[in-house]
Every structure is written in structure tokens, then in C-alpha cells.
């Protein structure tokens, strides 16, 4: 909603669409990260160490690093090294950059211990090893830190060559096993969350002034993948983004390739990565995504709307990611680039989208080291 990939329409989602949030808004997210995520992972890690299971320890380290990093990206400073240590009943909040660096170190350690093992299990489907998953996550976090060199080298090391490498959460027709967007739209809160008038829908709609298509790009099929036939709702039909059994990637081939495209130092390398995504799109959507050449980004080119060549390529890469990667990675891109792609501001009371999530009230009530209320429009340290 904040990035305007989707639109909040009804009840509390209409309120969220105007950026009106409270500390209670984020209670469940914090609980999922810490109580249901990190605490369980740390128990697994401890048991793996006790049992001498180095591979399981490595898997736990990668997952632990992932959870801490994702929390730090949206909340800023968070409890980290003292979490679940009985010596610290109120874990201290540690700096966002330090937490991200520590999370990357955890993932690196996990790769060393579990790297060659398949990352597929009964929840996640992939052809990737844990080393590939770990390196792809490191690429995401280095990019958020603005470390383009390490973001690029980690993304290249991930060696994601096709969508088979996607780390997909699988879904089924079983009760509570369905795609979460499908559950929300079909079973729980129909049309609270829509595509209606969202920036992403406008970019993909060939009749809209913001349409990102051109002589080499036809986005109609992708628009129909996201948007229901009524032109308003999420597409929950078979084959749609929010279909009942549609999988959802934790990290994907497309995200990794677009990290390479953004961070590569040569235009040829940028184009190679971007065009690999376009070839993927052509197959996935059975539509036209012809390969770009550098001339397309020069003055007067079909992919240049008055920018320098470098900025025209950056715009195309970031818009492609915006229309391909749903959720928090794209949110970080908007923050990191100072809204380079021009996501509309949906509230008349501000000139920016929310810069962070608000610490939950449960932390204020239970942690003596709670740092105090920080407004959602205060940038986190890495984006300040």
C-alpha cells in the first residue's frame, strides 16, 4: 500500500492508504519476526549445535539473519545480539546498520555450514542450494545499505539462472494452505485491498498516461495477471497473481537479476541482466518483451523520457522491479532512491511515503530499553 503497488480501499485499509498507522498496527508483524520467527530459529540452532548437526545450524543461521535483516530494514534500530539471552530481560536496541551487518555475517556463516544442501523443503520450493539463497539475501541487504560492489558480487555468486531458483512459498487448496492474498480477498476481506488506481496498475495499463510499455514492450498480459476482469480487484482466478494455489517468492530470479542490473558497472552488464528478466517476462506472460540495446536509452530512444543514459537505464530497471517484486524489497528501493520512480504520495498531509514502521506498543510495555516513539516519517539511519 505504501509503495502504491496496491490500493487500500475499505475500513482500516482505506486508513492505511492515507498512511494513518499506529503502534498497534505493527504488533502482529513484530510478533511474527521475534516470537514466531527468531525465537523458534534460535531454539533450532541451539539443538543443532547440541546435536552436532552443522547443516541444520547453517540453515538456522541463514534464516535468523534473514529475520533480523528484514526487521531492521523496516523498523531501523532493533534488539539484536541480546535477544532471548536470559542475562538480558530487556534487550538493547542496536543500530540499524550494525544489525544489517551482523545479519549478513550470520548468513555468511550459514552458507559455510549448509551451502551445498538443497534449500527446498515441505514449505519452500526451489532448485537452489542454501548457498544460493544466502547469497541472494546478502545481495538484497547490501543493496539496501548502498554497498553496490558487494550487492553485485553477492547477486552474481547466487547464480540464479531461471525462475526455478525462486525460493517460493508453496500454496494449495487445503484450508489455510491457500495463497494469503487469495485468502484475504476471497475468504476474509473482499475488496479491502485492490489494484484500483494503484501506480503499478497505471504503469501496466496501456490506456493510462503512465503506461510503461513501448515498441519493444507490451504489458497488457502482465496487467491482466495482477488485475481482475473488473479492472479493480486482485486477480484471484487460476493463473492470476492471487490465485488460490499461486506460490509467492521470498526471493526470486527477477529480483536477483535486477540487483545485478542496477549495480553492474558497465552498460553491457546492466543490459544483459535486464534483458534476462525481459526474456523471462516474455515466456511467463506470453507477450512482447524484446531485448533492449543501449540506443534505446539514449536521447530520443524508446526507453528514455528526458533522462541521461544512466538515469534512463536506472529508471527502467527500477520500474521493472516495481512491477515484478511485490512488497518490502520494492519499499526499500523507493526509500533508498528517494522515490526515483515517482511513486505518488497518497496523503495530502505529507510529501513522502512512510519511511519506517512504528515500534509496537508491546515493546514499550515490556522492554525497559525501548527507545521511545519514532514517527513513521522519520527516515531510518541507512536512508538518512
What are these regions, as identified by a protein language model?
Residues 1-16:
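N-terminal leader/linker segments that initiate helical-solenoid repeat arrays
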Residues 3-4, 20-186, 216-384:
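Acidic/polar-rich alpha-helix caps and helix-coil junctions
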Residues 183-225:
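C-terminal amphipathic alpha-helical segment
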Residues 12, 18, 199-200, 228-230:
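Terminal low-complexity, poorly structured segments
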Amino acid at each position: 500500500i505504501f509503495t502504491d503497488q496496491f490500493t487500500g480501499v475499505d475500513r482500516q485499509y482505506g486508513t492505511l492508504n492515507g498512511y494513518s498507522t499506529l503502534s498497534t498496527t505493527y504488533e502482529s508483524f513484530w510478533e511474527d519476526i521475534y516470537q514466531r520467527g527468531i525465537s523458534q530459529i534460535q531454539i533450532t540452532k541451539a539443538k543443532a549445535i547440541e546435536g552436532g548437526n552443522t547443516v541444520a545450524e547453517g540453515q538456522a543461521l541463514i534464516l535468523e539473519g534473514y529475520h533480523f535483516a528484514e526487521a531492521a530494514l523496516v523498523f531501523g534500530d532493533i534488539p539484536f545480539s541480546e535477544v532471548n539471552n536470559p542475562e538480558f530481560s530487556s534487550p538493547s536496541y542496536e543500530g540499524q546498520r550494525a544489525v544489517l551487518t551482523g545479519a549478513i555475517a550470520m548468513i555468511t556463516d550459514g552458507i559455510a555450514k549448509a551451502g551445498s544442501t538443497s534449500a527446498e523443503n515441505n514449505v519452500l520450493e526451489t532448485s537452489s542450494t542454501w548457498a544460493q539463497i544466502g547469497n541472494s539475501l546478502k545481495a538484497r541487504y547490501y543493496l539496501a545499505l548502498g554497498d553496490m560492489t558487494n550487492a553485485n558480487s553477492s547477486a552474481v555468486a547466487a547464480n540464479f539462472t531461471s525462475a526455478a531458483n525462486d525460493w517460493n512459498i508453496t500454496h494449495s487448496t487445503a484450508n489455510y494452505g491457500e495463497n494469503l492474498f487469495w485468502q484475504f480477498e476471497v475468504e476474509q476481506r473482499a475488496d479491502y485491498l485492490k489494484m484500483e488506481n494503484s501506480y503499478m496498475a497505471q504503469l501496466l495499463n496501456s490506456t493510462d498516461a503512465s503506461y510503461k510499455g513501448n515498441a519493444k514492450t507490451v504489458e497488457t498480459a502482465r496487467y491482466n495477471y495482477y488485475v481482475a476482469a473488473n479492472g479493480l480487484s486482485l486477480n484471484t482466478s487460476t493463473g492470476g497473481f492471487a490465485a488460490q494455489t499461486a506460490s509467492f517468492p521470498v526471493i526470486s530470479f527477477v529480483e536477483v537479476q535486477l540487483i545485478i542490473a542496477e549495480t553492474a558497472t558497465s552498460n553491457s552488464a546492466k543490459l544483459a541482466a535486464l534483458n534476462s528478466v525481459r526474456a523471462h517476462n516474455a515466456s511467463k506472460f506470453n507477450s512482447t518483451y524484446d531485448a533492449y540495446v543501449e540506443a534505446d536509452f539514449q536521447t530520443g530512444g524508446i526507453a528514455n523520457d528526458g533522462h541521461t543514459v544512466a538515469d534512463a537505464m536506472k529508471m527502467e530497471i527500477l520500474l521493472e522491479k516495481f512491477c515484478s517484486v511485490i512488497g518490502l524489497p520494492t519499499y526499500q528501493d523507493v526509500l533508498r532512491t528517494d522515490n526515483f520512480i515517482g511513486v505518488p504520495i497518497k496523503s495530502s498531509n505529507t510529501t513522502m511515503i512512510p519511511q519506517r514502521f512504528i515500534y509496537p506498543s508491546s515493546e514499550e510495555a515490556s522492554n525497559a530499553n525501548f527507545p521511545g516513539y519514532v514517527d513513521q516519517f522519520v527516515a531510518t539511519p541507512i536512508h538518512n
